[in-house]
Amino acid sequence: MFVTAYFAVISLLALCVGLELTARRLTPPESSAAVNPAFRRFQATFLRAYLLALWADWLQGPYLYKLYRHYSFLESQIAILYVCGLASCVLFAPFSGWLSQALGRRHMCIFFCLSYATCCLTKLSRDYFVLIVGRILGGLSTSLLTTTFESWYVHHHVEIHDFPKEWIPTTFTKAATWNHGLAVGAGLVANLLAEWLHLGPVAPFLLAVPFLACCAWFVLTDWAKEEAEKSPEGIKQTLPLGTLNGGVTHLSARARFSRSCSDGLRCMLSDKRVMLLGGVQALFESVLYIFIFLWTPVLDPHGSPLGIVFSCFMAASMVGSLLFRVATSTRYHLQPGHVLCVAVLMAFFSFFMLTFSTVPGQPRPHESFLAFLLLELACGLYFPALNFLQGRIIPEEKRASVLAWFRLPLHLLACLGLLALHGEVSGTGAGETGSGTRHMFGGCAVMMLAALMAVVSLFTLGRNDTDLKLEGSRGEGEMY
């Protein structure tokens, strides 16, 4: 597996370079946003902090499970740790947007840095309770990362700078491109620290702390300067909640939160397309959480360099994202709905393969590795296709609340899957006995079949629906 992983990462990165060059030739030129100096300065101010936060997040990916095994915890105990993180996401995600409005978006970004740094430092402890607290902080931090940074940017882009809304995807496209590269690089750096330098699986978590500190510094300085220059009334908007004006802000934010939740639920229940798309998202992404838990115990017993394997996964996802750009370009004009069907079908075949490659006593790690790469390739196709359809089907003003409702069954399904693993001894025949892992992959394959049926139902329902189709012009629903 050692040689296979290195060969795979080199091959995938070379493929990424070729696809990126092809995609650039087929993609229309940038809008006027690219040459607007004020916009570029504002974009750079945001990305400096945001990319540091993403980098710190990715550093923790390759060796989390390995760290818990290094501390001699059983797989069932590790499953509970993962469940605590997911449950924390379920509990805090609905309130993260409200807290950003009530306490201030910039303050919540600083709080993210503090909570995530504390989460990383808890990894130094072998105490199970301390690690549970760390996972709870990790779930809170993840929910903040996915909401507060983007919320700050969109608010300042539209309300403070009054830039055109059409320029927003320019920033998030650039962030997504960097995000893939950072993920690949994080796996390589984590592998360097943990295995090449023999610093152990805790080293990547400790390395993330100074990057989170740098992120907080940029938020404190650059973002504060941005707010001071562009929003002279900003001080009034961020009064402590104990003051009179702070209490008004708190009450209005709570009222907006309640109304947003009810509007999002009504939007889901009144539009069958939204319900079906939410079902696809809940099924597909809950399975991904189970994959995140299982890939290490499947591959690690066979001498796989986990950081390099993680980089392979991220490179495969990047290949999928680039293939989506090429497939939906003006030259090929493949519809995002068709790409979504292909992605779900690929994920099904991936888990179908894994049910045979993880037979207890007869593990086939190379086949499992190939199946995982196929799954990550499917993810690269899935996310931009889903973003496009969400942008077309879900009204913009209700999108955040609807997506929050989508995440609830998503995390609950993932928690149930991990709790099912907790209930039986799991293994792949490489040091552990039992067939829990194989059974879980079989369950994931069934869930992918259900997701495929939901996709087919969605496009049968909207066969002649222009909202589900990519038009010649790039509109509001275009993928980021």
Swiss-Prot record:
GO molecular function: molybdate ion transmembrane transporter activity
GO CC annotations, alphabetized: plasma membrane
Entry's Gene Ontology BP terms: monoatomic ion transport
Gene3D superfamilies per UniProt: MFS general substrate transporter like domains
Segments passing through the bilayer: 1-21, 44-63, 78-98, 129-149, 177-197, 199-219, 274-294, 304-324, 339-359, 369-389, 401-421, 441-461
The keyword Protein biosynthesis appears for this protein: no
Compartment list: Cell membrane
Biological role stated in the UniProt entry: Mediates high-affinity intracellular uptake of the rare oligo-element molybdenum.
Protein's name according to its UniProt entry: Molybdate-anion transporter
Taxonomic classification: Eukaryota, Metazoa, Chordata, Craniata, Vertebrata
Gene: mfsd5
